[in-house]
Amino acid sequence: YEMLRSLVGSEMCIRDRDEAVCRKCKRPSCIYPKVCPNLNTDHRPLLDIYHAVDALPGIKKSFIGSGVRYDLLLHQSKDPNTNKSTQEYTRELIARHVSGRLKVAPEHTSDRVLNIMRKPPFSQFGEFKKIFDRINHEEGLRQQLIPYFISSHPGCKEEDMAELAVITKRLDFHLEQVQDFTPTPMTVATEAWYTGFHPYTLEPVFSAKTQREKLAQRQFFFWYKPEERRNIINELRRIGRTDLIDKLYGKR
C-alpha cells in the first residue's frame, strides 16, 4: 500500500500508571475537569507505534485522521520527559501523519455547555490551533484543522449557537463537520436531556427537543450560506441579540 489510513494512534492508547489507584477512585472522568496525575500521558509508546507502522514493507505514509485529544497534548505533567514526549508527538503528528486535514472535536464554544459535556474549555482549541498553524508554517505545509461541533446539546440555547457562529467566523471557519445532538444510553448528557436536570447537581437543564427548536440552533452553523441569512437575522432579533448581526454580516 502507498498509504495506510488508520486510527491505530489516538490517545486512547494511553493507560493509567497504577490500576490500584483507579479501583479506589470515584472520579467519573480521568481527564475532566483536570487530567488525573495517575494517568500516564507519556506519548513515547504512541510514537513507537507510528514508527513501527511506517517501517512496514510497502507503507509509504501513515495518516491519523481523527481521535486526537488536544487537551492531552496541551497537558503539562510533573515529569519533564513526559512533557518532552508530548511536544515530540505533536510535531510528528502534524508534520508527518496528517493527510491534509486533521479532525478534532471541540464540540462547542460555550464553556457552560462544555461543562455538561465534560469537555475542556474552548480556549484550549485556540491554543492547539496556534500550535497547528505554527508547525505547518515551519514545515512548509498547508494543512487544515477541521473542528467538529454539536447543536441542541443539553444546556445549549440559541444564544450559545449564535455566539458559536461569531467565534468560528472570527477563526475563519466555514463549518462542515457538525451534528445535532442524539441521545445515547448511559451518558450524562442523555440523562440531562431526558429528565431536564443535571444528574450530579440536580440543576435544571434546558434541551432543544422540538423540530423548530433544533432547526433554530442548527442554522447558526451555516451563517455563511445566503439562504440562511434572513432566518438567522430574524432569530437574532427574536432572542434580543441584534449586536451579533453586525458581527456576522457587517454593518448594514
Where are these regions (language model features)?
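Conserved AdoMet/S-adenosylmethionine-binding subsite of the radical SAM
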Residues: 19-181
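Single conserved hydrophobic/aromatic residue that forms the stacking wall/gate
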Residues: 1-9, 14
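Short glycine-rich loop/turn motifs that provide flexible caps or phosphate-binding loops at active sites
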Residues: 8, 99, 239
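Flexible, glycine-rich loop/tail regions that form catalytic "lids" or insertion modules at the edges
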Residues: 102, 106-108, 144-252
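Generic secondary-structure boundary/loop-capping signal
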Residues: 4, 90, 95, 110-114, ...
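Short alpha-helical interface elements
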Residues: 2, 78-79, 118, 129, ...
